[in-house]
């Protein structure tokens, strides 16, 4: 009888562990679209982020009430790292176009997520995706400077280092030029293409 209850307890804990993570992955995948171009600055985060936050709060309330502290820690530890790496993966593979306002929206999404995560996981942060968005905001020169300073790996650690390869860094740089390449003036487009191509070569050299 005791072993049966222990097996049931283990099954429940594993289910809770997987449930919150699948909810996170689904919500973040919904949040990151192929195009995040917003006409005007928005004061509220993406609806999918608000929904995710609601789920996180409800989940944390239930689990912290009924699950012992050691098991609670096992269920909730690593949620921030999961979000950070998955968002970085989505933005470096799925995202095809983003403007300044779209980037600002994503940064707001991160801020809201991070504040909520700190109530669940001590010291929770999203450093890698924050760096990606900060570099987009800073522009192509900052991306090239980062590649020059850190070379292969882009100064990241662990799985993030493996994700932000030379090709992904180039993709980030190309994202910063999307708006300029839509300019109606042909000479402006040609100039932007020249600058982009030269900087792509620099990234190849620095991250080889």
Roles of regions detected by a PLM:
Residues 1-208:
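Extended alpha-helical "rod" scaffolds
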